[in-house]
Amino acid sequence: MSAIVGLDTRATMDLDTTIKGFTLTHEAVLSIFKDVCAVQIDDDVQFEVMGVADIRETDDYPGIRVSLKANYPPISVPLTVDITTGDMITPREIEYTFSMLFDDRTISVLAYNLETVLAEKLEAVLSRNIANTRPRDYYDIYILYALRGAECDKATLRRALERTTE
């Protein structure tokens, strides 16, 4: 969301990622995150894996949530990473570039395109019904359409919504 709408500091409680070509198990995810957290970077931030758990927002949304703690003494911040596999990205993922906060460089990640993000948000609203939908889903739909609606390819959005609701 942040990269799509240009809000680099969008408040969020977690990170979401979809992986390809990987069997999603607690053991494998725990091993990978422990390895990543052990990487030393000269920024005084230390990450600690607190645990892993299954997540199922619906039966069609299996995944694993990794609970982490980011330590930058004296600050300690909890965060989570929700990991899924097999999500349909229509037509394909795209590359986003992020500027580092404390370093004069960028990193690139493959991420959902605008139409797939909108399709997933719309599907969440429709499947949960109005009484159970999270306010941030409505906000995300509004902000995506308000800021990037003119760039949204309607045919791609339709295909993405069809694939998301299969």
Per-segment meaning from a language model:
Residues 2-166:
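Compositionally biased terminal segments of proteins
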